Amino acid sequence: MDDQLKQSALDFHEFPVPGKIQVSPTKPLATQRDLALAYSPGVAAPCLEIEKDPLKAYKYTARGNLVAVISNGTAVLGLGNIGALAGKPVMEGKGVLFKKFAGIDVFDIEVDELDPDKFIEVVAALEPTFGGINLEDIKAPECFYIEQKLRERMNIPVFHDDQHGTAIISTAAILNGLRVVEKNISDVRMVVSGAGAAAIACMNLLVALGLQKHNIVVCDSKGVIYQGREPNMAETKAAYAVVDDGKRTLDDVIEGADIFLGCSGPKVLTQEMVKKMARAPMILALANPEPEILPPLAKEVRPDAIICTGRSDYPNQVNNVLCFPFIFRGALDVGATAINEEMKLAAVRAIAELAHAEQSEVVASAYGDQDLSFGPEYIIPKPFDPRLIVKIAPAVAKAAMESGVATRPIADFDVYIDKLTEFVYKTNLFMKPIFSQARKAPKRVVLPEGEEARVLHATQELVTLGLAKPILIGRPNVIEMRIQKLGLQIKAGVDFEIVNNESDPRFKEYWTEYFQIMKRRGVTQEQAQRALISNPTVIGAIMVQRGEADAMICGTVGDYHEHFSVVKNVFGYRDGVHTAGAMNALLLPSGNTFIADTYVNDEPDAEELAEITLMAAETVRRFGIEPRVALLSHSNFGSSDCPSSSKMRQALELVRERAPELMIDGEMHGDAALVEAIRNDRMPDSSLKGSANILVMPNMEAARISYNLLRVSSSEGVTVGPVLMGVAKPVHVLTPIASVRRIVNMVALAVVEAQTQPL
């Protein structure tokens, strides 16, 4: 580690507060009553319920989502036996990964005890606190004994990740690698370097999946492990001892091997050894930080080799974070009493299958131009693939139920998977009613920026989720090339339609219709033709206008107002509406907040504000939310008389005339809108109850500033929109920062609007 990296790491761990984890309350502690419920006397009620039924601890405490990361520091991350205290940063780091990838809370526990039996006593006594135990960085062979004894004694999952995590990922990689090179697991021969926890666990899993034990040769620091080599050989090693044929070294046994599994140390495998391996060999060089052989050296002599390492700077990284958070997620969610072989094998299969799926946009963004299509350079998923939790946790949970170790079986896996999806996509719960409605009758949605990677990823999701019938505008050869490069599985003409923006035979009809719309706005026939060629949003808008598409989503490239100008000119406003407006949703930990008008009207008058407010309330109801509207101003219920506050008061009167049932009040300050106590202090008889969820601003400047401040200041908040309101057709204009999920969300909303506004 160079000095700069070392200092950066030390600063990272020291500032702004020491360490990487903290405990945060999940219940409010704002009043005396809150304290009485959280502690004495109210806390006695759940205590007595748990005394009567211990399983209620999962209902009334955090136990069901709490894992202990426990170590004695005897084998810390390549640092060796540095002791329990020195290993604490690693254990905190493990806790951060649990939380980041699976939402699991962790207490890291460093036990200063080298005696395995005493260590077992300490850990076993902690069972009432935790839903699961993750053993970490405990040296072999003690780790085998400790895990075995704890599993026998405890009725919660005990999982030594150094063994099983590496084994699960390695096994998934081997299954996929064999598929790539078309070899059968029952026929291949494997040579293993290292006989520690990970190597033994990996061999056990592979044997369970069909690898023949007599086709495995293991080498440790003393050479080949053969029967009779030493009288007191550890039982775990002895299980893989081969009949003595006189071969003593790795070089002696590597010839003809299909698989090399390295769990040992750097530079153990040489180029000469690699040359002697079988056709299309698999090399898993997992020693860290320097593997048994560097991939470029192996590829130099065997271009046909498939290579995995534990490093992120080479393809096919075997990284335990691919499995341990999600195995525990599935185990905790069914109240598993153990993580058994069936659950591990379920994880292996789920991980292996995910590598065959289309590429995730999140992964594509993280890994740049890497080709992440299934093949020699991509046989296991990347650690940041957001689908890992959705695939692995349900597979593990099902295996726990089928193998009889689940105490709280899941009744509806569709609901469970939806809940897991909420962890991946924070908008999932919010969008659920929209998605459900869209699936009932998917509509044709045209996407003018059809060559964009985000749009292509969104198209894949739309097809997979059954939300829409996408129509992409773009050059077919470019779209096909990018689909292949992105590793997507959608097919033009099957999953979506392409409109060639260079040569569609309908273009004369399109520009003629556009000219008819624009001819009295200074647009000539020649300009109409040029607009169609240069601006795919014009093509999309005309398609919707002609009934060849039901809705349109544009704006992922270019200026919002240029796109909106096309939309406004082609479609105009809905009947009875004299303006349009844009609204953004912020999904914050404190609740959902909608802000209008964020993009369309610079200085709306009272009439326009009233229309925007009514459209905002209508839109919010689509999400299954009852609107509560606050009209905001620097004035608080008449405290200041100026044009801005006056128009907000006028808008309130207009809204109340047109929608007397709507819960609305104003004009008011922002704090009064969000905190009922502040509002009631100023206006005790306010018709607005609770916290407002729609904030209507006096102008676009205030709306955009408020929206961006809230968006950036809330690290846990996510956004939906902008939602375009008031246009005669189901159309939304996004912005260039729109993510794939935002595109998907807005397409689904447009579909629902098209269902209720038939063309």
From Swiss-Prot:
Residues at the active site: 39 (proton donor), 94 (proton acceptor)
E.C. no: 1.1.1.40
Lineage: superkingdom: Bacteria
Positions contributing to a divalent metal cation binding: 136-137, 162
Cofactor note: Divalent metal cations. Prefers magnesium or manganese.
Catalytic activity: (S)-malate + NADP(+) = pyruvate + CO2 + NADPH; oxaloacetate + H(+) = pyruvate + CO2
Pfam families in the record: malic, Malic_M, PTA_PTB
GO terms (BP aspect): malate metabolic process
Notes on activation and inhibition: Inhibited by 4 mM Mg(2+) and acetyl-CoA, competitively inhibited by fumarate and oxaloacetate. Activated by glutamate and aspartate, glucose-6-phosphate, acetyl-phosphate and 2 mM KCl.
Keyword Repeat recorded: no
Membership in a protein family: In the N-terminal section; belongs to the malic enzymes family. In the C-terminal section; belongs to the phosphate acetyltransferase and butyryltransferase family.
This protein's name: NADP-dependent malic enzyme
Protein species of origin: Escherichia coli (strain K12)
Gene behind the chain: maeB
